[in-house]
Amino acid sequence: MSDPVLALRGLERVYKTEAGDLPVLRGVDLDVYPGEVVGLIGPSGSGKSSLLHSAGLLERPDAGLVALEGRDCSKLSERARTRIRLGTVGFVYQFHHLLPEFSALENVAMPLTIAGKSRREAEARARELLESLGLGHRLNHQPAQMSGGEQQRVAIARALANRPKLLLADEPTGNLDPATSTAVFQALYQVCREQGVAAVIATHNMELARYMDRVVALKDGHLELQRV
């Protein structure tokens, strides 16, 4: 078996509240491998977003190890963490956050041009991703001209533009109807498998969880393997 893209060991996260310390992650361990899509479930407030933010180097855990491609990132400087995050991790959120004045092609190409790619190279990669997600006919459409499901697929393409090794998605289909949610998830799953991207997807949708390679549940700050 290949080495994990993401490895969490003994992850702990505690928030300060007026009532005292609120632990949301208590010694979480998790490995995610190339091309594996892992579902993360749990009630609101259980710590799903905290786990994703820690895994994606957006937050520092209070204790524990976060390793990306075998490198412990827990004690690196913010500059080093940012560099690794930009090169290794893609994010998808419940809201697509597309720039309304740009086309689908331009939205997806933008992270590549920011990273120093030529316009030609950026647009070629953007076109490849959009076509793989069934949006080859929507390249020049702005977000307002697309359905919610199409907008979210553009957001997925944008997250994958820089060829990340890890994709973290926080309720990526939460604003979509059931049929559209399934279609978007299937497109996401397929492109992650094809490109060997490890993915962790937080969701409340148990129907979608059934399609994932593995599902883990956050309960009382601990991860448990979930049968679906």
Swiss-Prot record:
Class of enzymatic activity (EC top level): translocase
UniProt: ATP binding residues: 42-49
Repressor in keyword set: no
GO CC terms of this entry: plasma membrane
Membrane topology annotation: Peripheral membrane protein
Any single GO BP term: lipoprotein localization to outer membrane
Domain ABC transporter: 9-228
InterPro entries with a match to the protein in the record: AAA+_ATPase, ABC_transporter-like_ATP-bd, ABC_transporter-like_CS, ABC_transpr_LolD-like, MacB-like_ATP-bd, P-loop_NTPase
GO MF terms, alphabetically ordered: ATP binding; ATP hydrolysis activity; transmembrane transporter activity
Stated role: Part of the ABC transporter complex LolCDE involved in the translocation of mature outer membrane-directed lipoproteins, from the inner membrane to the periplasmic chaperone, LolA. Responsible for the formation of the LolA-lipoprotein complex in an ATP-dependent manner.
Family: Belongs to the ABC transporter superfamily. Lipoprotein translocase (TC 3.A.1.125) family.
Quaternary structure, from the entry: The complex is composed of two ATP-binding proteins (LolD) and two transmembrane proteins (LolC and LolE).
Record-given protein name: Lipoprotein-releasing system ATP-binding protein LolD 2
